Design a protein with these regions (language model features):
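Residues on the lipid-exposed face of transmembrane beta-strands in outer-membrane beta-barrel proteins
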Residues: 52-58, 86-92, 180-186
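Transmembrane beta-strand segments that form the barrel wall of outer-membrane beta-barrel proteins
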Residues: 67-73
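Transmembrane beta-strand segments of Gram-negative outer membrane beta-barrel proteins
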Residues: 34-35, 60-67
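Outer-membrane beta-barrel initiation region
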Residues: 40-45, 54-58
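Surface-exposed loop/interface segments of Gram-negative outer-membrane beta-barrel transport/assembly proteins
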Residues: 1-34, 44, 74-79, 85, ...
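Outer-membrane beta-barrel channels and translocator barrels
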Residues: 47, 58-59, 95-97, 187-189
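Repeated loop/turn-to-beta-strand initiation elements of outer-membrane beta-barrel proteins
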Residues: 60-63, 97-100, 192-194
Length: 218
């Protein structure tokens, strides 16, 4: 406030009485502001899961199929994960001694998060401990307010607003995986059998990090 009103030197030389009435009013207004950063930055975590399975068969053929979906909203807005998974298994009895089978597992997992800046300000746990309780995120017109005092001992003079940072940045990763297993069993009698198994696995991970020109991370 003193810097915005260009009265820092006046305060250093003459104290409170040297400030203008507008500056004193702006400072006094801070007494009515008590921002609860815990309530603003965090929320209750919530997760939901759905599964559907189908199985059956005959004396020679059996099958099992399942589909699952899981979604988790983290305790920070914009942080979460969702996952799709598919499982398929089947076996076939060729004759009295030979049985073959195949299994397939497919999974897609997407993680969303905030983009962490070099100073760690976008970390809500860290920021909630440094932010002043009298700082308001928005002005009376609904525009972002900026905190210029959050980071000391740096030449980074950009203002910071953690909600704007979330709006202008994103950190997303997607993992797609697929695996299959093929097996065969030769059963000669109750004591002797021969089994063979072959497996294949493929996994692909992609990541996208976005920080536009208005973000503190830039």
């Amino acid at each position: 406030i003193l810097s915005n009103y260009n009265e820092l030197s006046a305060f250093q030389n003459g104290g409170w009485d040297a400030l203008s009435s507008d500056t004193q009013a702006a400072i006094n207004r801070l007494k009515s502001v008590n921002t609860n950063w815990g309530d603003i930055l965090f929320r209750d975590a919530f997760s939901q899961e759905y599964n559907l399975s189908l199985s059956g068969g005959t004396e020679r053929v059996t099958y099992y199929t399942s589909f699952g979906y899981y979604k988790e909203d983290g305790n920070v807005d914009g942080v979460g994960m969702d996952r799709f998974n598919l499982v398929g298994k089947t076996s076939y009895k060729v004759n009295s001694i030979l049985k073959v089978g195949a299994s397939m597992f497919a999974n897609r997992r997407k993680n969303t998060n905030y983009l962490t800046d070099a100073y760690g300000m976008s970390n809500p746990v860290f920021y909630s401990r440094k932010a002043n309780p009298y700082f308001e995120l928005y002005d009376k017109n609904g525009n972002y307010n900026y905190d210029y005092d959050i980071q000391n001992n740096t030449d980074k003079d950009l203002g910071f607003n953690i909600f704007e940072e979330r709006q202008n940045t994103s950190n997303e990763s997607v993992v797609n995986s697929f695996s299959s297993i093929f097996d065969a069993e030769l059963r000669f009698n109750d004591k002797w059998k021969l089994t063979s198994q072959f497996g294949y696995q493929l996994e692909k991970t992609s990541r996208e990090e976005i920080a536009d020109w208005e973000s503190y991370a830039m």
